[in-house]
Structure formats: structure tokens, C-alpha cells
């Protein structure tokens, strides 16, 4: 369970288990866990694989990649679906100890029903080559996100510090469901979940400056 500030509790990961996986930054909160916290979880789980899902790390988060040299049971997974806007291509990758990667290669075709086709492979390679565009795009999204945070604060919203391409916000006075309906009527689409603890929050994706100014 997440604590009052939307952080994971490392004690939850110190129980007997068959493996550990968690997102960093988190979705839908955008909250980032420190490398110290991740290392604490790794130290408590030396005999199982610990997977850190970094789908949103390119929007200002700190990657756990530096910890790979110390922990052979760590796997870091990332995707092209978010920061590179290539969700339809089904491109992702995993970085870890050579032995773990070997085991993954041995079994990947037995459970992966979304293997990449040739166009996806070609586009993925070209996307990696265009580092200038990638950095410019993520830098712009981060700048827009930080500006929108200030605007939302002035409008009475509260939210955890997001390191993703969205903001998980709630208003001090207006219920989230009421805001969700009003925004939808204005053709502005945000995410709302009618679930315990998050029912009074909206996940607001960061778009262009023009879109956010609406």
C-alpha cells in the first residue's frame, strides 16, 4: 500500500515472495522513489528478481541503472511507448545481469504474444538515432508540466510531485467527479477512477502549451 504521500512502503517488500516488481515513477501518481529506497528493497530480496518498471523515467526521474553493477538480481525495464510516443510499435527493453538476460531470451517466445514486426524494429532503431529530437521533446514536456503545476496550485489544486508526463491532482473544494464531467463537456479529457482513495483525483496528461492553456 502507498503511504500518505503516495510512496511505496519498503517494508511491504521484505516479506517472503517469488519476485518483486514496481513502477518508478509510479502511475498514476507520478511519484518517484529514491535510489536509496530501491537499494533497500534489493538488499532485502537477494534471492529473487527485483524488476523496476521505468516507463516514465525519461520525464525527469532517476534511473536505477547505476545499481545494476551492485545487484545481479535487478532488472530495469523501459519502453518506447511514453517518452518516444511509439505505443503502437510495442517496443520495450530490459537491462540486467547477463545471466538473467540469458534466461529471459530462453523463454521470451513462450509468453510474449506481442513480438515486434520488422517496421517496429526499423522505427525503433531510427528513434534511438534521433537523440536530439528525443531530448528536445522530453525537455519541453517537463517544462510544460512544471508550468502547469504552478497554474494548478494557484487554482486550488494539490498533487504529489510528478516525475512523469502527467499530474495526479485533486481540488480542495470541487469533487473530482464533478470536475471530470465538466471538463468532458468542454471536450477536455482527463482520467478519473471511481476507486477507493483515488476517487477524488484526476490524472491530467501533459500536452502542448496550447492544449494545457485551455
PLM region spans:
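PLP-dependent aminotransferase class I/II
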Residues: 73-153, 157-160
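Short, acidic/turn-prone active-site loops that include or flank metal/cofactor-
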Residues: 1-7, 56, 79-81, 195-196
Amino acid at each position: 500500500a502507498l503511504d500518505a504521500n503516495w510512496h511505496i512502503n519498503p517494508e511491504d517488500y521484505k516479506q517472503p515472495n517469488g519476485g518483486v516488481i514496481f513502477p518508478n515513477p509510479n502511475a498514476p501518481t507520478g511519484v518517484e522513489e529514491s535510489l536509496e529506497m530501491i537499494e533497500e528493497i534489493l538488499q532485502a530480496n537477494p534471492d529473487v528478481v527485483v524488476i523496476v518498471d521505468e516507463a516514465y523515467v525519461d520525464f525527469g526521474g532517476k534511473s536505477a541503472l547505476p545499481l545494476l553493477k551492485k545487484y545481479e538480481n535487478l532488472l530495469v525495464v523501459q519502453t518506447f511507448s511514453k517518452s518516444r510516443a511509439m505505443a503502437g510499435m510495442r517496443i520495450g527493453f530490459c537491462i540486467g545481469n547477463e545471466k538473467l538476460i540469458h534466461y529471459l531470451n530462453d523463454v521470451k517466445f513462450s509468453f510474449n504474444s506481442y513480438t515486434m514486426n520488422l517496421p517496429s524494429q526499423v522505427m525503433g532503431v531510427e528513434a534511438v538515432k534521433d537523440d536530439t529530437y528525443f531530448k528536445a521533446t522530453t525537455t519541453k514536456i517537463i517544462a510544460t508540466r512544471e508550468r502547469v503545476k504552478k497554474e494548478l496550485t494557484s487554482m486550488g489544486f494539490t498533487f504529489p510531485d510528478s516525475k512523469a508526463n502527467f499530474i495526479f491532482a485533486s481540488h480542495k473544494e470541487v469533487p473530482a467527479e464533478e470536475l471530470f464531467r465538466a471538463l468532458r463537456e468542454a471536450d477536455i479529457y482527463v482520467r478519473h477512477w471511481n476507486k477507493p482513495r483515488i476517487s477524488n483525483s484526476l490524472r491530467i496528461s501533459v500536452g502542448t502549451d496550447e492544449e494545457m492553456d485551455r
